[in-house]
Amino acid sequence: MDTLLNALSSDQEQMKAWRHHLHRHPELAFDEHGTARYIAELLRGWGYEVSEGIGRTGVVARMRCGDGTKSIGLRADTDALAVQEMSDSDHKSTVEGRSHTCGHDGHSAMLLGAARYLARTRAFNGTVNLIFQPAEEIMGGAVAMIEDGLFERFPMDAVFGMHNMPKLERGKLYFTAG
């Protein structure tokens, strides 16, 4: 794990820049059009096959490497909340009454960091699918993507999602089946 963290440390400032961009431009559930375009453009630039509009405003990016037959999914959420941000930070929301107060900007930035690392190193043998899910806050985005054929169009043996949890010990990963 230390080797991976060291490899990603050179991208730390870029990941912050992605997060700050997303934080300044929050979009509510099923209205993440600008977010989807931004993410898709980055992923295409790194060589991913990108599909937009999955489940209305979701993005799925796929990369194959080697001759492996396993296919995994890595998932992050993209929507913001209808909450006024009270921060004075330089990357404060520019949209009145909307903000990324639940951390989905961070989730997306972390998955973009993983995407760039995987594209650069191709450190896997099989297929990786990056799932940028809309509308997590209203609990409709996953269903919309599944009903839009997510798993038929992008077969996966396993999907890994994540959520940042500020109260958990820094530098630790916690897993649960689900």
Which ranges hold each PLM region?
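Histidine/acidic-residue-rich, glycine-tolerant segments that coordinate divalent metal ions
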Residues: V59-V60, L81-V83, S87-S99, D105-G106, ...
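Acidic/His- and Gly-rich active-site-bordering loop/insert found
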Residues: D2-H100, A109-L112, R116-F124
